[in-house]
């Protein structure tokens, strides 16, 4: 998350690559391409960030991966796992990623939304396009509910933690098939999705292991989780003795209550 960068739309004086071996190799021409450009606009699409520049047809596509983050500093103090350093006017912007699943790519601004990363991406969960009518266009599918919510071509940016929390809030089982849902249940999914995401944003996201927000702050929504990572603990909605269950779906952990999520 690039909280804070929008306030520092400064000229890039130079870019230094400390380690090029991220998910994709850092472009060798990164410094040459970006030197003296001014950041003018920052967009988010799903889990991707896009940086645009004044008087340039180039843009940057950035993915933070599992553990990546940016930090702004007044002076260069390098830390372990720093990979790319952007020297701005009066500020230094540093990309750090412990697991190196993140990446930085250069694209032409007219091609970026047609890139393999973005072209098939679904609607934004907080946008008006995510609604009953949109959901109904997928309603004949026989996939399970959580699987659809995790599908980036259906809805952009939802991760494993939030899917479990959304379905708990909507009182729906992650195992339900899409073609079994009625209109009321779909409306509840849409409503719960927007509710949980807005609440998570207000708490700065969710820090489980390594995730931090800019300026190296953690996300406090971890303290508000009602089902995720609470397996074998009492359901916060049901009576005592009803425990949260953990299962595996498509290789990912899912947490839910068998009693109140139907």
Regions found by a protein language model. Name each.
Residues 1-104, 227-228, 233-237, 250-262:
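A cross-family signal for N-terminal binding/gating loops and helix N-caps
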Residues 13-16, 147-153, 206-212:
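Short coil/turn segments at secondary-structure boundaries
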Residues 53-157, 162-169, 177, 184:
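Phosphate/anion-contacting hairpin/loop surfaces
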Residues 136, 164, 171-175, 234, ...:
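A feature for loop-to-transmembrane-helix boundaries and adjacent hydrophobic helices
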Residues 173-185, 202-209:
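Short conserved catalytic/interaction loops centered on acidic-Pro-aromatic/His motifs
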Residues 185-202:
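Basic, amphipathic alpha-helical segments enriched in Lys/Arg and hydrophobic/aromatic residues
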Residues 201-262:
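C-terminal accessory segment of soluble enzyme catalytic cores
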């Amino acid at each position: 998350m690039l909280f804070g960068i929008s306030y520092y739309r400064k000229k890039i004086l130079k870019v230094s690559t400390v380690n090029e071996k991220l998910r994709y190799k850092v472009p060798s021409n990164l410094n040459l391409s970006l030197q003296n450009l001014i950041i003018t606009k920052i967009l988010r699409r799903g889990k991707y960030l896009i940086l645009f520049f004044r008087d340039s047809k180039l843009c940057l596509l950035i993915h933070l991966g599992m553990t990546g983050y940016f930090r702004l500093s007044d002076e260069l103090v390098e830390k372990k796992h720093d990979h790319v350093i952007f020297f701005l006017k009066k500020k230094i912007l540093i990309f750090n990623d412990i697991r190196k699943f993140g990446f930085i790519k250069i694209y032409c601004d007219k091609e970026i939304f047609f890139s393999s990363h973005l072209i098939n991406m679904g609607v934004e969960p907080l946008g008006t396009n995510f609604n009953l009518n949109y959901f109904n266009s997928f309603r004949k599918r026989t996939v399970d509910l959580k699987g659809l919510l995790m599908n980036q071509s259906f809805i952009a940016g939802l991760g494993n933690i939030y899917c479990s929390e959304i379905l708990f809030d909507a009182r729906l089982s992650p195992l339900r098939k899409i073609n079994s849902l009625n209109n009321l249940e779909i409306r509840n999914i849409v409503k719960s999705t927007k509710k949980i995401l807005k609440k998570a944003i207000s708490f700065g996201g969710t820090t489980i292991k390594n995730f931090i927000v800019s300026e190296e702050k953690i996300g406090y929504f971890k303290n508000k989780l009602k089902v995720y990572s609470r397996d074998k603990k009492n359901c916060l909605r049901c009576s005592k003795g009803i425990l949260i269950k953990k299962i595996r779906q498509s290789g990912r952990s899912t947490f839910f209550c068998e009693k109140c999520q139907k």
